[in-house]
Regions:
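Compositionally biased, intrinsically disordered linkers/stalks adjacent to structured regions
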Residues: 146-150
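Short conserved active-site loop signatures built around small residues
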Residues: 154
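Short, conserved alpha-helix that lines the donor NDP-sugar binding/gating region
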Residues: 158, 162
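Hydrophobic pocket-lining residues that define ligand/cofactor binding sites across diverse proteins
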Residues: 165
Length: 301
């Protein structure tokens, strides 16, 4: 069963002035803008002060929980509005949330003396479900699901939304993905040697790492066909090791997605690569792409 993308919102460093853009499936392609160069963020690592490139999107250096939740609400409401859904859809449409950040920036600010949470967070309860709980009460929506699987969080949220739609458990779905700056994620990726230390991002050629950034986006999905149609999904877990990637596992996931879409490799016109910029991961991904889609153009964003 195909899934139509009825509307979408996007807010990132590459959108004009970091503002949210909302568009429906009848609006055509997302407007292109001149690429924005990354800014910088600093961290203290093993007694050293380190500055790395970073794509800032939101006005505040660290979003409070209240500010973040308001931004996410705007994405949900605008996606539903652009999809021409009824006003009550935010209360009865399942919402699938993918992120690694959640309210981490708020938690970090709460360590500062005198900082008071605007939404009254329980300082003894560090849960990823606070965002879901907030929208459960704000929207009166019981069907809100959270996904935190590192770089694949929003992709997994999208896959499970598609599975629920195909199973007939719902008629519509909203998929919300977001990332905002927090020191834990920034320092974690740096400690793993995954972050670039220069503004140049050249995966598959110079494996110097990738550039982190902030963003938020939301998709409004329905069963059927549309101007933009999601035809196939697939997911998998690479069990080769904690720090290495198996090219065979990457190839199997792509083959599964093609099978789910009833498509042949020759029909694929573009691959948006993972392209994380680490030598082992890029080598495995490149090998899988060469084996399955040797002549298909690739884009790393």
């Amino acid at each position: 069963m195909n899934i139509a993308i009825r509307a979408a919102t996007l807010q990132c460093a590459q959108s004009r002035n970091g503002q949210m853009h909302a568009f429906s499936d009848s609006d055509g392609l997302y407007p292109l803008h001149a690429p924005a160069a990354p800014a910088e963020r600093s961290l203290a690592f093993l007694g050293r002060h380190i500055t790395l490139p970073y794509f800032n999107t939101f006005a505040a250096a660290k979003l409070s929980a209240a500010d973040l939740l308001d931004i996410l609400y705007q994405h949900l409401s605008q996606a539903a509005l652009q999809a021409d859904w009824p006003s009550e859809s935010l209360a009865n449409t399942p919402i699938f949330i993918g992120s690694t950040a959640y309210l981490m920036s708020e938690r970090e600010q709460m360590l500062n003396p005198g900082y008071v949470s605007e939404i009254g967070l329980d300082t003894g309860r560090h849960s990823l479900t606070h965002v879901a709980e907030h929208f459960h009460h704000r929207l009166g929506n019981p069907d809100i699901f959270s996904f935190a699987t590192s770089c694949t969080s929003s992709a997994n949220a999208l896959c499970y939304a598609v599975k629920m739609l195909r199973a007939g458990w719902c008629q519509r779905a909203l998929v919300l993905g977001f990332e905002n700056f927090n020191a834990l994620t920034f320092e974690h990726f740096h400690a793993m040697g995954l972050l670039a230390d220069t503004p140049a991002y050249t995966p598959f050629t110079q494996t110097g790492g990738f550039i982190c950034g902030e963003a938020a986006a939301c998709l409004a999905l329905e069963c059927g066909n549309g101007a933009a149609t999601l035809r196939g999904i697939a997911g998998g877990t690479d069990t080769l090791g904690l720090t290495h990637t198996d090219s065979a596992a990457v190839k199997r996931v792509m083959q599964a997605a093609l099978s789910d879409a009833a498509a042949q490799p020759g029909q694929i016109r573009l691959v948006k690569t993972h392209g994380i910029g680490s030598a082992a991961a890029d080598e495995a991904e490149a090998a899988a792409l060469h084996a399955l889609l040797p002549n298909t153009p690739r884009a790393a964003l």
